[in-house]
Amino acid sequence: MNNINKNSQKDRPTYKDTLNLLQTNFGMRANATLREPELQAFWREKNIDFELGLNNTGETFTLHDGPPYANGTLHMGHALNKVLKDIINKFQTMKGKKVCYVPGWDCHGLPIELKVLQAMDKSQRAELTPIKLRKKAAAYAKKQVSQQMDGFKRWGVWGDWDQPYLSLDKKFEASQIKLFGEMVFKGYIYRGLKPVHWSPSSQTALAEAELEYPTGHTSKSIYVGFKVNQIPKRLTQEISKQAPDLINSEGKLKEVKLVIWTTTPWTIPANEAISVNQKLEYVIAQSSDRSLIIIANDLLDEVSKSVGINYEKRVLIKGSILDGIIYKHPLFDKISPVVLGGDYITTESGTGLVHTAPGHGVDDFNTGKKYNLSISCTVDAKGFLTKEAGKYEGLNVLKDANSVIISDLINSGSLLKEIPYEHRYPYDWRTKKPTIFRATEQWFASVEGFRDKALSAIEDVIWLPESGKNRINSMVRERGDWCISRQRTWGVPIPVFYEKNGQEILLNKETISHIADLFSVHGADIWWEYEVSELLPPSYLNQADRWQKGTDTMDVWFDSGSSWSSVISKKENLNYPADLYLEGSDQHRGWFQSSLLTSVAVNEHAPFKKVLTHGFALDENGRKMSKSLGNIIDPLVIINGGSNKKLDPAYGADVLRLWVSSVDYSADVPIGSNILKQISDVYRKVRNTSRYLLGNLYDFDYKIDSIDIANLPLLDKWMLNRTAEVIDEISDAYNNFEFSKFFQTIQNFCVVDLSNFYLDIAKDRLYVSSKSDFRRRSCQTVLSLVIEKISGLIAPVLCHMAEDIWQNIPYDLEEASVFQRGWPNVPKSWRNSSFNCHVTELRKLRAVINRMLESCRNNQALGSSLEASVRVDISDEKVQAAIEWLAESESNNVDVLRDWFLVSSLQIGGEPWAEVLVSEDNDYASVEIAKARGFKCERCWHYEIEMSKNPQHTNICKRCEKVVLAI
């Protein structure tokens, strides 16, 4: 129906200036590269960041920082870790806890030493002394710390940046020496010859945590026959019973070979015995050419296939009967025994007979000690065979030694087969090169001495996810003693003195205490700078000529593993045990374990109450990030943008933080350009919803204009109750470290509950009503309460946006910062869950109507939903009850069903309409949509039958006329 108002189009008044349009300085775009640093400066200026948590009066909460390594640029793993920690700390701070987060750095170790050496030419290296190297390494580490610290700050991470802990600090080194001393006094530290993981490329021993196992390593595996020289009498008797034809006329067994399998041919020269399991069943088997071998019965078929020879079983014997066989070495003129090993000898692989070189394997070493075998190390620090290997001296065990030895085994008739074998093999995590087992004199922590206490302590800790407990339990249960010495310069020295002309070691309470005191004042450099006489306590000065300093340094895992001793058990406002340790899942064998072992050894309990782990950051295709794949995502590029801003836009720190909150970090997490776009979209939705709330509060002062909660319309009361539910849900999410639930809940709240429902309905109240109308003020009351809560709820994650919102709330607030307000609480008056069932039914009906209206728009039958009239026949009791519930209220023309459905008119029941655009019947209602009757109000866009009679305003409805004339 056409509008027949008499005013010409030219003379009609415009009503834009009479509407309450949005006004706010809170931009649609974050402009994060400029705005976020401004907000960080505001926090520093007002002492709101670290100082806020420190000045809280609640109970202390301590998240102890696992120190990142002070080398290299920050990557997505750093971002995932540090942002997770910051989310937790900010949440605990807002809850009123006393939070003192002390960030730390691991500053010693080979990678830094190598960086220093790589930056020098040959002449500089030739002039390099240990102390010069240490000075350069310290300077390098401190520079790296400064750069990484700047990055963490830019991410919005709060912490005691003025007083971080560094493992190179004097006090830290002194505390570490004292901890080492306490373990010495308890009998948990010893020196001994043992096979350890040795890195020829680094020329130092390595701990298990310093190893990695890349895929694709292939070894030369060999089956070797060791010719039997002599057999014990009881074995001869057993053979005579089962296969007398194998005994010759002299009563001796015909030629037979013991078959072993190994993946390290270079260890054959070091063979001292062959070990068998006395519980296993072995067999003497005969080939078609009548040659005999001894092998585990269960492995005969598999070995036959591998070597390509068919064998017939002739004699079955227990492993215990093999004890005492004497065999000849296949390469040297030497005889050795068959001995009984342990349960490490199985039939899972190999032959059931284990080539035993006590200097090159832990099980071999233990068996060697048991039988008093020679424990010789045939390899030097660089990986070359020594004179103990005879004619093979000078060959490199990782290069040419294997080929030469295999060739000689072929020539001696001892090699049955060589087969390439792909398997997990330990590599040096720093140099990315293979390691070996090598027996050397090292310092060890005797884990066996406190293993049971450590396992008990694990049970007292909450592990998240729970699988972490089983993981670390099995690691501690199965691990050997901890090799804590390293043959490097850049580290904390093991404070021991060795007798120059004897075997004695000087290491006692007096010497350790004295060294610790010296380190606390001068630092560990003095171990290299001072003479022995300057390092010994006064009572030993007359013996200075007798002693010399040790040259070993401590494993860097001992450094970081002692951080609880120098940080959380020493500094004020920190808890020991810490409330939480949070690191990557690889730290079960790293920092979690080293911290656990040192704390249990000294204090018999874990240094943490709860341990939370996260996975690794991968690319969008689930691949590990690497330069070779070209798939590295740089957190700095996420924040500031790349060289091509279209490809790599500047998202800011909050989008990075929102990504962290969005993922299931208990597993490995993907990140890439597509994911960032999705996260940015969610960020924008939260921001724009917040902007809409702020923009409608420009003329609102809560103290003056707010409406009492009890007098609010039903829709508003429902909105507050829904906000209360969201606060509960998000609080639980933060408390349980389930940040992805926060992400989902806040997104759903802003988009579904606010933008698509409450605010969609509220637009008419906000824009069209007079400024001080109850319809508008009641809605503004809700908007002000909700925006304050949203600001608080997002603050731990979207800290910059939350603060920006707070600074743009147009009325006076008692707190200068959202973080000073504290965690959002829920007033009792907000809660009324009885609304939910009715609103749910009405929203269900609203969704049907919206879908039908959308269909009309798509068919170009309608433009705005206000061009429609709706008739509904209700057939469902719940929907009918909801409509009646709303009709009973209609508070000041707010709770009107047509406004909830955003149509110009609504009819419940009555006769079906003759002319409809679309209709639908479902289980709970019959819905018809038709063109609205009447005239379109040019101010509110509703269609009304009766329009203004005022000659100046004939194009607006009577409701709008009252508002306009009152202006």
From Swiss-Prot:
Its EC number is 6.1.1.5. Catalyzes the attachment of isoleucine to tRNA(Ile). As IleRS can inadvertently accommodate and process structurally similar amino acids such as valine, to avoid such errors it has two additional distinct tRNA(Ile)-dependent editing activities. One activity is designated as 'pretransfer' editing and involves the hydrolysis of activated Val-AMP. The other activity is designated 'posttransfer' editing and involves deacylation of mischarged Val-tRNA(Ile). It is found in: Cytoplasm. The keyword Amino-acid biosynthesis does not apply. It is an enzyme of class 6 (ligase). Monomer. Zn(2+) binds at residues 937, 940, 957, 960. A motif ('KMSKS' region) lies at residues 624-628. One of its GO terms (biological process) is isoleucyl-tRNA aminoacylation. It catalyses: tRNA(Ile) + L-isoleucine + ATP = L-isoleucyl-tRNA(Ile) + AMP + diphosphate. GO terms for molecular function: aminoacyl-tRNA deacylase activity; ATP binding; isoleucine-tRNA ligase activity; tRNA binding; zinc ion binding. ATP binds at residue 627. This is Isoleucine--tRNA ligase. Its cofactor is Zn(2+). A motif ('HIGH' region) lies at residues 68-78. CDD domains: Anticodon_Ia_Ile_BEm. Belongs to the class-I aminoacyl-tRNA synthetase family. IleS type 1 subfamily. L-isoleucyl-5'-AMP binds at residue 583. PROSITE patterns: AA_TRNA_LIGASE_I. Binds 1 zinc ion per subunit. IleRS has two distinct active sites: one for aminoacylation and one for editing. The misactivated valine is translocated from the active site to the editing site, which sterically excludes the correctly activated isoleucine. The single editing site contains two valyl binding pockets, one specific for each substrate (Val-AMP or Val-tRNA(Ile)). One of its GO terms (cellular component) is cytoplasm.
